[in-house]
C-alpha cells in the first residue's frame, strides 16, 4: 500500500472503499472478466491509485482506450503522472455520471466494459439508480458492467441489466463480491449513436458510428 493511498483513506474514509488496495489476485480475477482480443473502450469508476487501471492497460490493445473517472484530486494527479505517456488512457477528474458526455466528447460511441470499485452501498438511492442508468446507457449491446464490492446489495437495484453473474472472492482483504451485469445484444441505440452490427460479444468499438 502506498503512502498516498493510506493518507487519502484517512482523509476520506467514506469515499475510498477499503483501507488497502485490491490484491494482485483480485486484480487479475477482475481483468479476466474482460475480453481483450480486440480493441475496446473501457471506463473505470474510482480507480484510486490505479492497481486495476495498470492491469487493464497492460492487457488492452494499442487501439483500445481507458477512461478513468476519479473524484479525488490527489489520486487524479497521480494517475495523470502514471499514464502521462500512454495516449490510450484518459484521466477525468470528475463524477462517473459524466461517462456518456465524456465518451461523446472524445468521439466514442459507447463502452465495451465499465469497471467500478466505488462503494455503491453508501450512495443515496436516487444517485445510485441514476448512475446505474447512465452506465447502462453508455454500454455497448453485449457489454458488461463489472463491480467488486464488500456487499452484493447493488444487485437488487441494477434491475435494468438483463443478466448478472456473481462470485465471492476470498483472496482479498476484505473478501469481495465480483459481479458482472450484462447488457443484451438487443439494444439498438444509445445517446444518439446508432448500432450497426452485432458480430462480437462484447461489441468492439469499430461497430459504431455517430448517428
Question: Where are the predicted features?
Answer:
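Glycine-rich SAM-binding Motif I of class I
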Residues: 50-54
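Class I SAM-dependent methyltransferase Rossmann-like catalytic core
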Residues: 3-37
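A short glycine-rich, Lys/Arg-flanked "PGG" loop and its adjoining helix->strand segment in the class I
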Residues: 129-141
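Conserved SAM/SAH-binding beta-strand->alpha-helix loop
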Residues: 72
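Conserved class I S-adenosyl-L-methionine
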Residues: 39-48
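S-adenosyl-L-methionine
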Residues: 76-105
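Conserved beta-strand signature within the Rossmann-like core of class I S-adenosyl-L-methionine
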Residues: 141-149
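SAM/dcSAM-binding transferase cores
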Residues: 5-10, 105, 133, 158-165, ...
Amino acid at each position: 500500500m502506498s503512502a498516498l493511498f493510506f493518507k487519502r483513506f484517512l482523509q476520506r474514509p467514506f469515499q475510498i472503499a477499503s483501507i488497502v488496495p485490491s490484491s494482485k489476485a483480485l486484480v487479475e480475477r477482475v481483468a479476466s472478466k474482460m475480453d481483450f482480443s480486440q480493441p475496446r473502450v473501457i471506463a473505470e469508476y474510482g480507480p484510486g491509485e490505479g492497481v486495476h487501471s495498470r492491469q487493464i492497460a497492460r492487457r488492452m490493445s494499442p487501439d483500445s482506450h481507458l477512461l478513468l473517472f476519479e473524484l479525488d484530486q490527489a489520486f487524479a494527479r497521480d494517475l495523470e503522472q502514471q499514464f502521462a505517456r500512454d495516449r490510450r488512457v484518459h484521466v477525468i477528474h470528475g463524477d462517473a455520471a459524466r461517462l456518456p458526455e465524456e465518451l461523446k466528447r472524445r468521439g466514442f460511441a459507447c463502452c465495451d466494459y465499465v469497471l467500478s470499485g466505488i462503494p455503491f452501498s453508501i450512495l443515496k438511492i436516487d444517485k445510485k439508480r441514476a448512475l446505474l442508468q447512465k452506465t447502462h446507457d453508455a454500454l455497448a449491446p453485449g457489454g458488461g458492467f463489472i463491480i467488486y464490492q464488500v456487499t452484493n446489495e447493488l444487485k437488487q437495484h441494477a434491475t435494468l441489466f438483463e443478466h448478472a453473474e456473481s462470485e465471492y472472492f476470498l483472496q482479498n482483504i476484505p473478501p469481495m463480491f465480483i459481479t458482472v451485469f450484462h447488457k443484451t445484444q438487443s439494444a439498438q441505440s444509445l445517446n444518439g449513436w446508432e448500432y450497426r452490427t452485432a458480430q462480437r460479444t462484447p461489441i468492439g468499438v469499430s461497430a459504431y458510428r455517430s448517428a
